[in-house]
Design a protein with these regions (language model features):
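N-terminal compositionally biased, intrinsically disordered segments and leader/signal-like regions
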Residues: 4-5, 225
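Short, highly charged, low-complexity non-transmembrane loops/tails of multi-pass membrane proteins
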Residues: 218-226
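Hydrophobic, aromatic-enriched alpha-helical segments typical of multi-pass transmembrane helices
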Residues: 2, 8-218
Length: 226
């Protein structure tokens, strides 16, 4: 018989962490959608990445959007770690979410800028932010799926989260290899592919995990045997 211990934590903090896990993707999405609506004439949702919003004179708004998401994702990662049964190397999934949050901070600290022709460009280091966020968020889902599989309370989400993580890694490769670089075959639809990665793959998985954490936070911690 295998005994799996569930970390005893403050349910109040876990509830707040779960709210942060839902609010992060939702507020971030609302933030860039509103900015896109304002910049309707000189911004393309299909071609331009979300980070191109930083190149605008009002780019500080998107920088703040990145930072707020980073804070909420970090809080969520901490609460999530405390809400899943402890396993060997189980810390890796939440830690990868934390690294993804660092990628968001880098995106704010090293924003895209506009050249004289009005085109956004990376003056340096912003590409590291994108690589960090998209790779680590996808890897986090894959690793978390393994930890979920070891916890009966989370097992029902394991397959979905694992598939989302694998799809996220595939999207990361497509974006980095075939869409984001100038002259790449899918460069003209890079913005669309980036948004699909977030809104169809990564964000729904994060919200599903956060909602499960919120539900479990209302239950008393216990020792689960399987």
């Amino acid at each position: 018989m295998i005994t799996t211990s569930v970390r005893v934590s403050r349910p109040g903090f876990q509830r707040w962490a779960a709210r942060a896990g839902v609010a992060g993707p939702v507020l971030f999405t609302a933030g860039f959608l509103v900015q896109e609506a304002v910049r309707r004439e000189d911004y393309s949702r299909v071609a331009d990445p979300i980070s191109a919003l930083e190149a605008d004179p009002r780019g500080w708004i998107q920088q703040v959007n990145f930072l707020v998401f980073a804070v909420l994702l970090t809080i969520f990662a901490i609460g999530l770690h405390r809400g899943i049964a402890t396993t060997r190397y189980g810390w890796a999934g939440p830690a990868l979410l934390g690294v993804a949050a660092v990628g968001l901070i880098l995106a704010a600290v090293f924003p895209l800028r506009e050249d004289p022709a009005g085109e956004p460009y990376d003056p340096g280091h912003h590409v590291i932010a994108g690589v960090t966020f998209f790779s680590c968020s996808a890897l986090a889902l894959v690793v978390l799926s393994c930890r979920f599989a070891a916890d009966p309370r989370w097992r029902g989400l394991a397959r979905y989260v694992g598939i989302a993580g694998i799809l996220g890694l595939g999207c990361f490769v497509v974006l980095g290899r075939f869409a984001m670089p100038g002259g790449a075959p899918l460069h003209e639809v890079a913005g669309l592919l980036q948004r699909m990665t977030l809104l169809v793959v990564t964000f729904p998985a994060l919200v599903a995990i956060a909602l499960r954490l919120r539900r479990l936070a209302c239950r008393p911690s216990a020792l689960t045997r399987s």
